[in-house]
Regions:
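Hydrophobic faces of well-ordered beta-strands that scaffold small-molecule active sites
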Residues: 3-9, 34-36, 60-63, 90-94, ...
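Internal, glycine-rich beta/alpha segment that forms the wall or movable "lid"
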Residues: 3, 18, 76-178, 182-210, ...
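Active-site mouth loops of central-metabolism enzymes
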Residues: 4-17, 65-72, 153-164, 218-221, ...
Length: 334
C-alpha cells in the first residue's frame, strides 16, 4: 500500500477553478486527501461541497477553519452536511487562527483559545453522535438540549487541530484525532508527539492512533528555484504572520535568525532582503527543496521522525501546467 500523501491549497491568491481541477487530478492519482484553507476570501465548506460533487475517492479537509467565527453548533452542522454530500470523505481541521484575523476581520474577541477549540471538538462529536448539545460538556456556553434535525452519515468525523504550543498540543491528545503542525522542524516532532501522548494518557486514549499531519512545504524545482522560493516563504511566515512562528523557531534554536529576518521584513525598504537572511539550516529544517527525486526521497526519510500524513502545500502563482507537474511528480507511489 502506498504511503499516504495529502495536498493543501495555498490561502493567498486563491483560484477556485484551478484548485478544483487540482483536486480532481489528485483524486485520480490516489492522494489521501485534499485540504482547503479559509482566510478572508472564499468560504471553505461551500468549496468543499463543490469538490465533493466532482471527486470520487479522495478525502476532503478544512485546513483550517477557525473556531471563533462560527459557533460550535454551526461547525458541527457544516461538518455533517459536507460529510453526507461527500459520502463519508470529510475531515474537520480546526485552529484558532490569530488575533488580527479574528478581531480585525471577524470582529470577534480573541479569547480563551484552548476552551474554544475544546468546545468545538466536544459539541461536534456530541451532535454527530446523535446526542444533545447540552450533553457535550462545553464550558463557554450553557446549551439547551438541541439535537441535529438530520441523521449524520457518520456518528463521528476525524477532527484534526492545528497547534504550536504545549497546552494546545496536549489537548489534542485528550480529544482530537490528528495534529497539524506548521513550520515545526521535522527532527523536533518527537517533542510535540510526547505532549500528545501525555494528554492522551490523562484521557485514557491511545496516542498511537492520533495522526501527525504537518503542513509541509515541498518545492520540487530544479536548480536554485526551490531554494529561492523556500527563502521567500520562510521570510513571509516569520516577518508577516505574527509571533507564533518566531516563538516556535526561537525555542528550537533559530532565535537570532528570526530576529534578523523579522527586522528586515518590518521595513518595506529592506523587506526584499529578508529572504536572503534565511539560512540553509532553516531551509533544511522547515522545507523540502530540490529536484523532484530529492523531494520524494526526503519526504520518505522524514516519515521516520513521526510524520504520518504529510500535507503538501501546493505552490501559488503558478500556471496549471506547473501545478499539474507538481501533483504528478509528488504523487504517492502505487
Amino acid at each position: 500500500m502506498a504511503e499516504p500523501i495529502a495536498l493543501l491549497a495555498f490561502w493567498k491568491n486563491y483560484d477556485r477553478r484551478l484548485y478544483l481541477r487540482a483536486a480532481q487530478l489528485a483524486d485520480e492519482l490516489g492522494y489521501h486527501s485534499f485540504w482547503l484553507p479559509e482566510a478572508w476570501g472564499y468560504e471553505v465548506f461551500a468549496l468543499l461541497t463543490e469538490m465533493a460533487v466532482h471527486t470520487k475517492r479522495i478525502q476532503l479537509g478544512t485546513g483550517i477553519v477557525n473556531v471563533y467565527s462560527r459557533t460550535p453548533g454551526l461547525i458541527a452542522m457544516s461538518a455533517a452536511t459536507v460529510d453526507e454530500i461527500s459520502e463519508g470523505r470529510f475531515i474537520l481541521g480546526v485552529g484558532v487562527s490569530g488575533k488580527n484575523v479574528i478581531e480585525g476581520f471577524h470582529g470577534r474577541p480573541f479569547e480563551k483559545p484552548l476552551s474554544q477549540v475544546r468546545d468545538v471538538v466536544k459539541v461536534t462529536r456530541a451532535l454527530l453522535a446523535g446526542q444533545k448539545e447540552s450533553e457535550a460538556g462545553a464550558t463557554l456556553a450553557q446549551y439547551r438540549p438541541f439535537k441535529l434535525e438530520m441523521k449524520p452519515l457518520r456518528a463521528s468525523v476525524p477532527i484534526y487541530v492545528a497547534a504550536l504550543r504545549q497546552k494546545a498540543i496536549e489537548q489534542i491528545g485528550e480529544c482530537a484525532d490528528g495534529w497539524i503542525p506548521t513550520f515545526w522542524p521535522y527532527d523536533k516532532l518527537a517533542e510535540g508527539r510526547a505532549w500528545i501522548a501525555a494528554g492522551a494518557a490523562r484521557a485514557g486514549r491511545d496516542a498511537s492512533k492520533i495522526v501527525t499531519a504537518p503542513f509541509t512545504t515541498a518545492l520540487p524545482l530544479g536548480g536554485e528555484g526551490g531554494t529561492t522560493m523556500a527563502k521567500q516563504i520562510i521570510s513571509f511566515y516569520i516577518g508577516g504572520m505574527g509571533d507564533y512562528y518566531i516563538e516556535l523557531l526561537t525555542r528550537f534554536g533559530f532565535g537570532e535568525d528570526c530576529k534578523r529576518i523579522a527586522d528586515l521584513y518590518a521595513d518595506k525598504a529592506t523587506r526584499a532582503q529578508a529572504a536572503d537572511a534565511v539560512t540553509p539550516g532553516m531551509i533544511e529544517a522547515l522545507t523540502i527543496a530540490g529536484d523532484p527525486a530529492h523531494c520524494i526521497g526526503e519526504l520518505r526519510r522524514r516519515r521516520s521522525f513521526g510524520v504520518d500524513l504529510p500535507i503538501l502545500n501546493l505552490p501559488t502563482n503558478m500556471p496549471w501546467e506547473m501545478l499539474e507537474a507538481f501533483i504528478r511528480g509528488m504523487a504517492p507511489a502505487t
